[in-house]
Amino acid sequence: MSVKVFCDIADLNNIKKFNNNNFVKGFTTNPSLMRKAGAKDYESYSKQILKVCNKKPISFEVFADNPKLMIEQGIKINNWGKNVYVKVPVINSKKQFTGKVIRNLNSRNIKLNITAVYTAKQTAKILKTINKKTKVIISIF
């Protein structure tokens, strides 16, 4: 089995430190971690992170709850860099499966990190939704 270690952080100093560590293969973050790290503007802070971490994979999460807006944000986030994965929660705040969002972004060959996955049923739905040609990370909690 191959295991890759990803840091779930948003603090720039810690990202700099772990980015130089070969054991760490990439990063993931989310809007609440970024707020906690002092980010005032999501996009500009994300781009600061990308100046530090421009070779290892990094996931930036959509923060919209509406499928149309999630897709729009996902497309925009994807354009920030070749090492970017778009992080999409498996369900929205209404407990609805985000399959439409996942399918749409995946069909555009956008790399995804599908997050907040808690059940085998959710994992199975994701696997039925993705095209399996484009890179996808499934973050199981």
Put a short name on every predicted segment.
Residues 2-3, 9-16, 21-24, 28-108, ...:
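Active-site beta->alpha loop and helix N-cap motifs at the rims of alpha/beta catalytic domains
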